UniProtKB/Swiss-Prot annotation:
Subcellular location: Cytoplasm
NCBIfam families named among the record's database cross-references: PRK05422.1, smpB
Protein name (Swiss-Prot/TrEMBL): SsrA-binding protein
Gene3D superfamilies: 2.40.280.10
GO biological process: trans-translation
Source organism, top-level taxon: Bacteria
Presence of the UniProt keyword RNA-binding in the record: yes
Keyword Zinc-finger attached: no
Purpose of the protein: Required for rescue of stalled ribosomes mediated by trans-translation. Binds to transfer-messenger RNA (tmRNA), required for stable association of tmRNA with ribosomes. tmRNA and SmpB together mimic tRNA shape, replacing the anticodon stem-loop with SmpB. tmRNA is encoded by the ssrA gene; the 2 termini fold to resemble tRNA(Ala) and it encodes a 'tag peptide', a short internal open reading frame. During trans-translation Ala-aminoacylated tmRNA acts like a tRNA, entering the A-site of stalled ribosomes, displacing the stalled mRNA.
GO MF annotation: an example: RNA binding
Record organism: Parafrankia sp. (strain EAN1pec)
Length: 158
């Protein structure tokens, strides 16, 4: 079987970019069981309620749903079990320091295969208030409208 190259997206957490201000992103490996890898290769996963927690100098991913592999038997995994993230020690120490400051959390943004290995993109994030979310939406709509008008002017269809 030929070796995989490139990046194949499995799941994205679109809600995270809406609910949080993303301050910094990291790429982490995942410790998975065999049936989890097969379920991911089938393109089935959900990051919606996921978050990362630091315990004993290790980072664990919680509430990420990887459904049971349909062809699996008694070796199947628990769909919402916690999974260990693989990061460099310096990155873990940096995340520990930042999350202890308060108001910051670690959330998963996307889950993908990179060169045949399962990876998760995690972000150091600060939660947004409802008025911040509305303000960001209004800014995005205004920018979209402005680019639409500028495009029309460039084409001479004012």
């Amino acid at each position: 079987m030929p070796k995989e190259t490139g990046r194949k997206l499995i799941a994205q957490n679109k809600r995270a970019r809406h609910d949080y201000d993303i301050l910094d992103t990291y790429e982490a490996g995942l410790v998975l069981m065999g049936t989890e890898v097969k379920a991911l290769r089938a393109g089935r996963a959900s990051l919606v309620d996921g978050f990362a927690q630091i315990a004993d100098g290790e980072i664990w991913l919680h509430n990420v749903h990887i459904p049971e592999y349909t062809e699996g038997t008694w070796t199947n995994h628990a769909p919402r079990r916690r999974r260990k993230l693989l990061l460099h020690r310096a990155e873990i120490e940096k995340l520990i320091g930042k999350t202890r400051e308060g108001g910051l959390t670690v959330v998963p943004l996307s889950l993908y295969f990179k060169d045949g290995r399962a990876k998760v993109e995690i972000a150091l994030a600060r939660g947004r208030k409802n008025y911040d979310k509305r303000h960001a939406l209004a800014e995005r709509d205004a920018a979209r409208e402005m680019s639409r008008i500028m495009g029309r002017q460039a084409k001479g269809r004012v």
